[in-house]
From Swiss-Prot:
Comment field (misc): Present with 5800 molecules/cell in log phase SD medium.
Any one cellular-component term (Gene Ontology): cytoplasm
The protein, known as: N-terminal acetyltransferase B complex subunit MDM20
Places the protein is found: Cytoplasm
Subunit structure: Component of the N-terminal acetyltransferase B (NatB) complex, which is composed of NAT3 and MDM20.
Domain of life: Eukaryota
Organism: Saccharomyces cerevisiae (strain ATCC 204508 / S288c) (Baker's yeast)
Record-level Gene Ontology MF annotations: acetyltransferase activator activity
Protein family per UniProt: Belongs to the MDM20/NAA25 family.
Key words of the record: Acetylation, Cytoplasm
Function: Non-catalytic subunit of the NatB N-terminal acetyltransferase, which catalyzes acetylation of the amino-terminal methionine residues of all proteins beginning with Met-Asp or Met-Glu and of some proteins beginning with Met-Asn or Met-Met. NatB acetylates TPM1 protein and regulates tropomyocin-actin interactions. MDM20 is required for mitochondrial inheritance during budding and together with TPM1, is essential for the integrity and assembly of actin cables. Genetically interacts with CIN8.
GO biological process: cytoskeleton organization; mitochondrion inheritance; regulation of actin cytoskeleton organization
Length: 796
C-alpha cells in the first residue's frame, strides 16, 4: 500500500500538482495520525514545491538530522528519509537515521537494512558499524553469529583500501585491532574463505613484521594439506619471502608444486631458495621435471636455473626452450625478459636451425621482436602475405605487425600530413579485406578515421570489433571522445543504438553490483567481495563514463533538446560519486591495444589528440555544464564553488590551455564570465571565440571547432539572462556568420582530402603502395562520408 501511495504522491509532485498532494496527505494523516511516514512525505512535498524557501533546519535537520529528536524504526520511513537526505547532499545524515533507529529500536531487520543501505552508498565505515550490530542477533538471521564478524572485517578492509582518507591514524589502528581480535576469537576457521579474510586483515591492516608473516605462513601452509587456493598461494609466497628463510621458502614452494601448481613464480622462487641452500643445479632440474613434467614453465625454468647458477643462459637450455616455442607468440615475450643473460650470436644460431629457410611467419616475427634482424617492413610483408590466403577466415594474421610498423612510424609525427594519414588508411583497408577479423588493424583504422573526423567510417570498423560488457569501458574512448562536436547525428546507429547500448553497462552494472555483493556476503564467498567493490569504484569513476555523460549534455544543447532528464541523471551520478568520499576519476581506458608506448601518440597535434582527456579536463567540462545549468537563475552554487576549489591552483587560462582545445577554452571562458561577472567582458570573449580558425588544421578539428562554436552560440542565444541588446545582436550575427560558412568550410576540407589522395599516387607514397601491391582507395567513399557529416552539421 505504502509503495502505491508514495508513487501517487511523487507522480503528483512531478506534475507540480501540489494542491492535490496536500489534500491526499491531509486525508492520510487523519486516517493514520501516528504514522511518521506521511509527515516525512509532506515535508518532501514542501521541499519540491519551493526548494529555495525550504527551511531545512526546522523541517528536516532538527527533527531527523544528526542531533534530531524524532527517531523511528519504520523501515519505509527510514528509506524515504535516507533518499531525501541524499538528494540534498547530506550523506552523513542519510545513514545516520538508520544508526539512530537501531539505537532506539534495535532489531535484526533494521540492522540488516542499515548494512545494505550502507553498501549501496559505498559507505564502508557505516557497513562496519552495522555488521557489528548484526552480530548481536545471531538467532534472528539466516547466518551464524560468526559470519557477521567476517562481514565486519571485510568492511574495515574496504575502508582501508578505498576510503583511507576517512580514517585518522588512531582510528585505523583501533579498527585493525578490532577486526583481528574478533576473528581470532572465532578460531579454528571453518573454511578457506574465512582464512582468506583473516590473511587479508593481517596483510593489509598491519605494518609488515616478522610476527605477521610467520602467522600468515603458518595458517596458510597448514591449509594446503587439504586443498590448493590461489589466494592463499599468493599470501604464503609473499610472506615466506619476507621471512628471508631459504629453507622455509623451498619447503613451501616444493609442497605447492607437488600439489600440482605449475606456477612460474613458484618455480623461480624454488630455484632461488635451492641455490641459497647450496642444492646442485642438476638436482633442482631433475626435481622440477619429475614433479611438473614438460611445460612452458619448466622449459623456461631451465633458463632461470642457468642464470642463477652461472649468470648466463646455456646453449642446451635455450635449445630446449626454442625447440617447442620458437614459432609461438610467447617466445619473444619470454626471452626478452632474460635478454641481458642470453648471448645474441648463440640465439641467432639456434633460431636459424628451427626455420632455416625463414618460411614461418610467427618465427620471423619473433626474431624481429628479439632484435635479431633489422626491420624491413615492406619486404617482410611481401614475403609472408601469401599466408593470408591459407589461414582460417576467423583467425587473424601476424602479417599485420609489418604494416603497423609503417603506420606507427608515420603517426609518430606531430601534425601528420593528410597524405600520410590517407596512406595509412589505404594500406590498412587493403589489408583488412584479406584479414577481416584482425583486431589490431581495425583499432588503428578507427583511430585514423577519427583523426580525420570521419566518424561514420570509424564506426563501421568499431562495430566490427564486437566489444561487449566491461570492454566498452576500456575501448569506447576510441570513438566517443568529443563525439558531440564530431558527428551530431541523433538518428544514426552510432548515437541512437551503440552509444545508448554501451552506456547501459554503467547503469546496469552499478545497479546490480550491490545485489551481487550482498549475495557474496550471504554465501560466504568473501574472496570475491573486495574485487567487486573495486570494479564498482572503477565503473563509478570511469573517465569514459563521465566524458560520455558530459558530451551528451553538450550534444543536447547543440540539438536544442530538453536536458532536464540528463541533468537529473548527472546530479544523481555525482551524488553517488560523492558518497564514495573520494571524488576523483578512474582512467580505465586501454591504449596499449594500439602500442606499448602509446603516450607518443597522445600529445597535442598527435594522432590521438582527440582522445587526450584527463582528470582536469573532465572537471572543467563538468563545471562548464553545471555553470550553464545555473545561469538562468543568476545565482552561484556551492557545488560549482567546491569544484572550482578542486582545480589546480594555477592561472585559469593556463589550466584551460593545458587541458582543452583552443575553442573549448574560449567557450568555457564565455560561460565562466557570465557566471562570475555577469558577462562584463562578454563582447570581447565572443569575438575571441569567433576568431578561433576553423580550418587551421585539416582533420577532426574542422568539425570540432565549428560545432563547439555552434553549441556555445546556440546556448547563449537561448539565455534570457543576457539583456544587453548589443550582445544579443552579436550572438545572432555570429550564428548567422557561422552557418553561412558551413558549406565552404567542409568543401574546403573535402578539397584538401581529394588533393591529398592525388598525392598518394606520386613520389614516395606512390612507390610504397606499388611495393606493397596496394591500390589507392576510391576518394569518393571518404568524400561521401564527409558530405554526410556536413549535412548533419548544416541542419543544426
Amino acid at each position: 500500500m505504502s509503495d502505491k501511495i508514495q508513487e501517487e504522491i511523487l507522480g503528483l509532485v512531478s506534475r507540480s500538482n501540489f494542491k492535490q498532494c496536500y489534500a491526499k496527505l491531509g486525508q492520510l494523516q487523519k486516517q493514520f495520525p501516528n504514522a511518521l511516514y506521511f509527515k516525512i512525505l509532506e515535508t518532501y512535498v514542501k521541499f519540491k514545491q519551493s526548494p529555495g524557501k525550504f527551511d531545512y533546519n526546522k523541517l528536516l535537520e532538527e527533527p531527523y538530522g544528526l542531533k534530531g529528536t524524532t527517531i523511528t524504526g519504520d523501515t519505509r520511513s527510514l528509506e524515504f528519509l535516507h533518499n531525501f537526505f541524499v538528494e540534498l547532499g547530506k550523506y552523513d545524515e542519510a545513514l545516520h537515521v538508520y544508526e539512530r533507529g537501531n539505537f532506539k529500536f534495535p532489531s535484526y531487520e533494521l540492522s540488516y537494512h542499515w548494512f545494505m543501505k550502507a553498501l549501496e552508498d559505498s559507505n564502508y565505515n557505516q557497513m562496519s558499524k552495522a555488521s557489528l550490530q548484526l552480530a548481536k542477533y545471531s538467532d534472528s538471521g539466516n547466518l551464524p553469529k560468526r559470519a557477521y564478524y567476517f562481514w565486519n572485517a571485510i568492511s574495515i578492509l574496504a575502508v582501508s583500501r578505498f576510503q583511507e582518507n576517512t580514517l585518522s591514524d588512531p582510528k585505523k589502528i583501533l579498527l585493525s585491532r578490532l577486526a583481528r581480535q574478533s576473528l581470532l576469537d572465532l578460531k579454528p576457521f571453518q573454511n578457506v574463505q574465512e582464512i582468506i579474510v583473516y590473511c587479508l586483515v593481517l596483510d593489509e591492516l598491519f605494518p609488515q613484521s616478522r610476527e605477521i608473516s610467520e602467522e600468515i605462513v603458518a595458517i596458510t601452509f597448514a591449509n594446503f594439506d587439504t586443498s590448493v587456493n590461489l589466494y592463499l598461494k599468493n599470501f604464503i609466497l609473499k610472506h615466506t619471502k619476507l621471512l628471508n628463510s631459504p629453507q622455509k621458502l623451498f619447503e613451501v614452494c616444493s609442497k605447492l608444486i607437488e600439489k600440482g601448481l605449475d606456477d612460474y613464480e613458484l618455480i623461480t622462487n624454488l630455484i632461488d631458495a635451492a641455490y641459497k641452500l647450496s642444492k646442485s643445479k642438476d638436482e633442482v632440474k631433475q626435481w622440477i621435471d619429475e614433479n611438473l613434467g614438460d611445460s612452458r614453465n619448466t622449459r623456461l625454468a631451465r633458463l632461470k636455473l642457468d642464470i642463477m647458477y652461472t649468470d648466463s643462459v646455456s646453449e642446451s637450455s635455450l635449445s630446449y626452450y626454442l625447440s617447442k616455442y620458437h614459432n609461438k607468440p610467447c617466445c619473444s615475450i619470454d626471452l626478452n625478459h632474460y635478454s641481458g643473460h642470453i648471448n645474441i650470436d648463440m640465439l641467432k644460431s639456434i633460431m636459424s636451425k628451427y626455420d632455416p629457410e625463414d618460411k614461418d611467419l610467427i618465427h620471423h616475427c619473433n626474431i624481429l621482436e628479439l632484435g635479431l634482424i633489422g626491420s624491413d617492413s615492406i619486404n617482410n610483408y611481401n614475403k609472408f602475405k601469401g599466408t593470408l590466403e591459407k589461414k582460417s577466415v576467423t583467425d587473424y594474421s601476424s602479417c599485420s605487425t609489418f604494416l603497423l610498423e609503417i603506420v606507427k612510424d608515420k603517426c609518430k609525427k606531430t601534425n601528420p600530413e593528410l597524405k600520410d594519414v590517407l596512406l595509412c588508411i589505404t594500406i590498412l583497408e587493403n589489408y583488412q579485406a584479406k584479414d577481416p577479423h584482425n583486431f589490431d588493424t581495425m583499432c588503428w583504422l578507427i583511430v585514423l578515421y577519427m583523426y580525420l573526423g570521419l566518424v561514420p567510417d570509424a564506426y563501421f570498423h568499431f562495430i566490427n570489433l564486437k566489444i561487449k560488457n566491461v570492454q566498452t569501458d576500456s575501448l569506447d574512448y576510441m570513438i566517443f571522445s568529443r563525439f558531440s562536436t564530431l558527428f551530431p547525428n541523433k538518428q544514426s546507429d552510432f548515437y541512437s543504438k551503440t552509444f545508448h547500448e554501451h552506456n547501459n553497462l554503467y547503469d546496469t552494472s552499478l545497479a546490480n553490483l550491490p545485489r551481487y555483493i550482498q549475495v557474496a556476503f550471504e554465501r560466504n564467498s568473501y574472496s570475491k567481495i573486495l574485487g567487486m567493490l573495486e570494479m564498482r569504484d572503477k565503473l563509478m569513476k570511469s573517465y569514459t563514463r563521465w566524458t560520455k555523460t558530459l558530451e551528451n549534455l553538450q550534444f543536447s544543447r547543440l540539438c536544442n533538446d530538453k536536458r532536464g532528464h540528463l541533468l537529473q541523471k548527472l546530479h544523481e551520478d555525482w551524488r553517488s560519486l560523492e558518497m564514495t568520499q573520494s571524488v576523483s576519476f578512474s582512467d580505465n581506458r586501454d591504449f596499449s591495444i594500439l602500442d606499448e608506448n602509446f603516450a607518443q601518440f597522445l600529445n597535442r597535434g598527435k594522432i590521438l589528440e582527440y582522445a587526450n582527456l584527463n582528470e582536469e579536463s573532465i572537471f572543467l567540462t563538468l563545471i562548464r555544464e553545471l555553470i550553464i545549468e545555473a545561469l538562468p537563475n543568476g545565482e552561484k552554487t556551492e557545488q560549482i564553488s567546491a569544484l572550482l576549489k578542486k582545480l589546480p591552483s594555477i592561472n585559469l587560462e593556463e589550466l584551460l590551455n593545458n587541458n582543452l582545445t583552443e575553442v573549448e577554452s574560449a567557450s568555457f571562458l564565455i560561460f565562466f564570465e557570465i557566471y562570475e561577472n555577469n558577462g562584463k567582458n562578454l563582447h570581447d570573449l565572443i569575438s575571441r571565440l569567433m576568431k578561433v580558425p576553423i580550418n587551421a588544421k585539416q582533420n577532426w578539428m574542422v568539425s570540432h571547432t565549428y560545432l563547439t562554436k555552434m553549441a556555445t552560440l546556440k546556448t547563449l542565444d537561448s539565455l534570457k539572462r543576457i539583456k544587453d541588446k548589443e550582445i544579443q545582436k552579436l550572438i545572432k550575427n555570429s550564428l548567422k556568420e557561422l552557418r553561412s560558412c558551413c558549406d565552404d568550410v567542409f568543401k574546403g576540407y573535402s578539397k584538401a582530402l581529394v588533393q591529398a589522395y592525388e598525392e598518394l599516387k606520386k613520389d614516395e607514397c606512390g612507390n610504397l603502395l606499388k611495393e606493397l601491391d596496394v591500390k589507392a582507395e576510391n576518394v569518393k567513399n571518404i568524400k561521401n562520408s564527409l558530405l554526410g557529416i556536413q549535412k548533419s552539421v548544416r541542419n543544426l
